[in-house]
Swiss-Prot record:
Keyword Nucleus: no
Family, similarity comment: Belongs to the EfeM/EfeO family.
Lipid-conjugated positions (S-diacylglycerol cysteine): C18
Designated name of the protein: Efem/EfeO family lipoprotein
InterPro entries xref list: EfeM/EfeO_iron_uptake, Imelysin-like, Imelysin-like_EfeO/Algp7, Imelysin_sf, Iron_uptake_EfeM/EfeO
Subcellular location: Cell membrane
Organism classification: Bacteria, Bacillati, Bacillota, Bacilli, Bacillales
Source species: Staphylococcus haemolyticus (strain JCSC1435)
NCBIfam families attached to this UniProt entry: EfeO (NF041757)
Topology of this chain in the membrane: Lipid-anchor
Keywords: Cell membrane, Lipoprotein, Membrane, Palmitate, Signal
Lipid attachment residues per UniProt (N-palmitoyl cysteine): C18
Signal is among the record's keywords: yes
Segments of this protein annotated with the region Disordered: 20-50
Amino acid sequence: MKKLPTILLASSLLLAACGNNSHSDDNSNKDKQSQSSKGENKASLQKATKEYEKYTDGQLDKFLDGTEKFVAAIKADDMDKAKELYPKVRMYYERSEPVAEAFGDLDPKIDARLADMKEEKKEDQWTGYHKIEKSLYQDNKIDETTKKDADQLLKDAKELDAKADTLDITPKLMLQGSVDLLNEVSTSKITGEEEIYSHTDLYDFKANIEGAQKIYELFKPELNKKDKKLSADIQKNFDKVNQLLDKYKDGDGFKDYSAVTKEDRKALSDAVNSLGEPLSKMAVVTE
């Protein structure tokens, strides 16, 4: 009878040990699942980034092709052709704008507005599409200066296209860049400041939205795992903005932005703002 407590104690210790081992196994399994989930997340983000790099590369290839045609029209003194090409070629650049930070000093060389250059007291260094835009749409002329500007533009477009494969594009840049771009559209671009001479702003807006939407679509599979409701909200708001932009289609292009009323501009701005809010939460895919 005196041995019974010893046996009971041994049994208790054995059961406790089994319980501890079970708890340890649970923790180990959870750790493995967590590590596996993180590994899958990392692989998914890398895949999305690679796909976006291909997308950007393709857009910049088309931007260069279009710029070559645009410059050829200027060299041929073909004002009508140059004006026809101007907004359409720029769309390739504007679709890539979420990651324009990675373009370095080529971005201002290609896309700076006169107001930006004046603010920095560098108007004498102004180059790019908007300088030529002023010649075509405000000055209504193509002269030797315009042709010289066109040569520089083509040189910069070629350099950017050559750099496309080496651009430092990351998930963080894609996510933050798309949000920053939409903020810019809803607060400053909406005023018509970018295409101040040509009034082709709606082409830019459409391309900016398409560029941001491409990023969303690439991250969507991972976002659906993390927050389906957020993903659906983003999609709904993209649809709303695109429906509003479709109202201003004119053939294969868009109406002159000067024809868009103040009220309609506000509606468009509000819609882009409503999109930007859930889009800013998309960084959850990196967690």
